[in-house]
Amino acid sequence: MNLQYKYKSQDYDQFIFCLEAVPDVETSSITEVVKNLERLALEQGIASIYKTCDSIEGLEESLTILLYDDHNFKDYEIIYLVMQGKRNTICLNNYYYSFEEIAELFEGKMKGKIVHFANAKILDLDQEEAQYFLDITGARAVSGYGVAHKTINSNLLDKAFFSLCQEFDDVVEIVEELHQKHYALCKALDFRLYY
């Protein structure tokens, strides 16, 4: 069973598509991510779709459904991925997939989107890896954190980032504002954005 939450946005024209890796999609539970998306909708009016996956096939299926069955896909500015992993991999069902494999899975499907990773995994791309991901996927930017902190969750900074993405079009301006408003947290989690 897959949880799906969709909220109506009064204030914004763009939405978030969140895909969270879980051990088993058949087991439904309300995760911290779901609670934070609910707060984001209630407090800031930013709508989201939330889905879970437990395999690379589930990730691909969710993305395909979003791309081809959701006629509002163009309105999803942020693809929010909450997945474990090491450095530049994601882990699904105890299998590790490289960033190159993920880029190829998303090939040409992320045009104009910001792909954002929660701090459940470290995002540490060199310039060549970042450019490859952006070129292959068509994404406008990829963002995440250089620190997968066990005691500091990125939810607060994620929400601030999502809100700024609604206010500003320029990714440089978004990052500057984020650092001005949340400098200590940006430094602690090593927020980074590649574009």
Summary of predicted features, one role per range:
Residues 1-76, 114-118, 136, 140:
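A domain-level signal for caspase-like cysteine endopeptidase catalytic cores
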Residues 27-29, 90-94, 126-129, 153-155:
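A short acidic (Asp/Glu
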Residues 123-195:
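Active-site-proximal C-terminal subdomain of hydrolase catalytic domains
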Residues 34, 102, 127-130:
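Leucine-rich repeat
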Residues 22-24, 86, 122, 149:
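Conserved beta-strand elements of beta-rich interaction domains across eukaryotes
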Residues 52-124:
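Catalytic-core segments of thiol-dependent peptidases
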